[in-house]
């Protein structure tokens, strides 16, 4: 698979910052080896890394060391706290709760809710939540109702091919609808991933913000100078001064 050129989480986050987004806490849920484009953009924030893979521990600890006051939670994010059976894939990054066990090996891992983590560690919003949990997004979000109420932006990876493996993977429309019911609407596309087979889009990283966000307060498409320049270009196309 390949990423669409010109799109990235960092570029999207920098646009959010330029537009005035303010944050106190950043949840990186599904860390793997880290999400470098997520770190260092917003000053003074706490990073909360949530990842069940034991193989990710050293990467998480290095990130926390670079960002004092941040947390490494060696557990999965779900709808309730406890333990769960996790399938570890050979490439590690594809590990998931919904992966067919024949494609990996089972491992019991601790599970937390983001609401529970926020309460236990006295975290505060505004939050940014990044989710990359291999189709388990809705389950992770179900345990984050309180956090979502203080979320200024959410980035979630989602498949456009539906549940192609029939294992319960979060799908595009249900995710958008679920978030919209909670007041979060689509704001930006941070990444588009195309499959090798035919370059069709397989998944995207979507950026959501509250419908009431100040980022959406201005409904104009252009400023006065941009409007005047656009009008002049269009008139010029018709041969008018």
Where are these regions (language model features)?
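Phosphate/nucleotide-binding beta-alpha loop and adjacent structural elements of enzyme active sites
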Residues: 1-241
